[in-house]
Design a protein with these regions (language model features):
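Cell-envelope/extracellular polymer assembly enzymes that use nucleotide-activated donors
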Residues: 3, 94
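Active-site loop/short helix in cyclic nucleotide turnover domains
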Residues: 7-23, 35, 39, 52, ...
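Residue-level recognition of strand-loop junctions within catalytic nucleotide-signaling folds
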Residues: 17, 57-60, 77, 100-101
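Alpha-helical scaffold within the catalytic cores of cyclic-nucleotide enzymes
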Residues: 32-33, 64-81, 114
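A short pre-motif secondary-structure segment
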Residues: 44-47
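Catalytic-core segments of nucleotide cyclases and related cyclic-nucleotide turnover enzymes
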Residues: 62-70, 99-129
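Catalytic core regions of nucleotide second-messenger enzymes
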Residues: 76-93, 109
């Protein structure tokens, strides 16, 4: 039994284009630190491309993964990132959640989480979908 959460930073390109890549890197660091503060030591957080992340949640049901995803979404939404030049930046994330069905590979579960993430983005971003 395991679940996967796929995360994408909403409008990350706009952050890089507006504030520069140094601020974009700062945003990534803040998001990673926040996520790490909310997951268990047995959970695995990995970067999956530019502004996408995956969390592997061993021994976690879909219901519990959805609760965690919502806590992460809210935690990021409530965060204010202070840049070195005094700007305050807020970001949101979209999350797709999937649970492994019997016989599915990790790759198949990641694909389901990616499809759920697409639905979250399609329905307005800053939300969790399964």
């Amino acid at each position: 039994l395991f679940s996967v959460i796929m995360i994408d930073i909403d409008y990350f390109k706009r952050i890089n284009d507006t504030y520069g890549h140094e601020v974009g890197d700062l945003v990534l660091k803040f998001i990673v630190d926040k996520i790490r503060s909310l997951i268990r030591s047995s959970d695995i957080l990995v970067r999956y491309g530019g502004e996408e992340f995956i969390i592997y949640l061993p021994h976690t049901t879909l219901k519990d993964a959805l609760k965690l995803a919502e806590r992460i979404r809210k935690g990021i939404e409530d965060m204010i990132i202070d840049t070195e030049d005094g700007k305050k930046i807020r970001v949101t994330i979209s999350l797709g959640v999937a649970e492994r069905d019997l016989g599915e590979t990790l790759e198949q579960v990641i694909k389901k989480a990616d499809e759920a993430l697409y639905r979250a983005k399609k329905h307005g971003r800053n939300r969790v979908s399964d």
